[in-house]
């Protein structure tokens, strides 16, 4: 695996409403916003700055392009965010991280094993466009590679990933998306690479389409249906005849 365990990762989260005073169970809210989640990876000189609402990403700041990227483009038409604020936070966290590394004698972060699940966005119909979702949870440190494979070959088109989204225990989760057209000829895998894994983990997915009935099965079903129908007709006729017979003796001739 190309990621070295010896590399140091620094993580500091500058958040709002993630750690309420008195504990998380003391405050109940209908909605929770997490603002300014900042992650800095010292070994690669990269970072991440995101805003979340109810666990969903609102936007992140592309630190290389120095611009705000909205999860849903229409959000950017209603509100705005100056990316310079994110750049200032990254500079502060980098400075603080250097101090913490010296105090901790450059102790590496503890690696947690991520958990991955693959599922489709909508019920699968062959030939109908759909989306595969690879949900990866319990990520720490937040350094991970997620790759989509079709028939064991990497895919680069139609793929999208969220940024790292924070959990209540300060681990992270991430979702990778793949737009595709289901086919019986294709199988898909979500490949996950992380420092905690000795080798990549593959999560397999292929369409589960009910097999069509054979001609023999169709014939048997039709014969059974016809037999049940005939039995119903015969039984119904018998009941009608018995009913008529039981009514006939009860009729008495009237006076002449």
From Swiss-Prot:
The lineage of its organism: Eukaryota, Metazoa, Chordata, Craniata, Vertebrata. It is a single-pass type I membrane protein. Residues 24-218 are extracellular. GO terms for cellular component: external side of plasma membrane; late endosome membrane; lysosomal membrane; lysosome; MHC class II protein complex; plasma membrane. Residues 245-256 are cytoplasmic. Residues 1-23 form the signal peptide. It comes from Rattus norvegicus. Residues 24-111 are annotated as: Alpha-1. This is Rano class II histocompatibility antigen, B alpha chain. The gene is RT1-Ba. Belongs to the MHC class II family.
């Amino acid at each position: 695996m190309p990621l070295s365990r010896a590399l140091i990762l620094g993580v500091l989260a500058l958040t709002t409403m993630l750690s309420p005073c008195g504990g998380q169970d003391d405050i109940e809210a209908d909605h929770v916003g997490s603002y300014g989640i900042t992650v800095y990876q010292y070994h690669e000189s990269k970072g991440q700055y995101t805003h979340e609402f109810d666990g969903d990403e609102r936007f992140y700041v592309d630190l290389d392009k120095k611009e705000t990227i909205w999860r849903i483009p229409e959000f950017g038409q209603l509100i705005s965010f100056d990316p310079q604020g994110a750049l200032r936070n990254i500079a502060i966290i980098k400075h603080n991280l250097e101090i913490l590394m010296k105090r901790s004698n450059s102790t590496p972060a503890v690696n947690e094993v991520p958990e991955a699940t693959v599922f489709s966005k909508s019920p699968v119909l062959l030939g109908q466009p759909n989306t595969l979702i690879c949900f990866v949870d319990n990520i720490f440190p937040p350094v991970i590679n997620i790759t989509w494979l079709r028939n064991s070959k990497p895919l680069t088109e139609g793929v999208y990933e969220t940024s790292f989204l924070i959990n209540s225990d300060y681990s992270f989760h991430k979702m990778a998306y793949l737009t595709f057209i289901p086919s019986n000829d294709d199988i898909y895998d979500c490949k996950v690479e992380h420092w905690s894994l000795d080798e990549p983990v593959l999560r397999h997915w292929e369409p589960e389409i009910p097999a069509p009935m054979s001609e023999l099965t169709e014939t048997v079903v039709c014969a059974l249906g016809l037999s049940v129908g005939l039995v119903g007709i015969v039984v119904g006729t018998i009941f009608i005849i018995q009913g008529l017979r039981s009514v006939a003796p009860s009729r008495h001739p009237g006076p002449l």
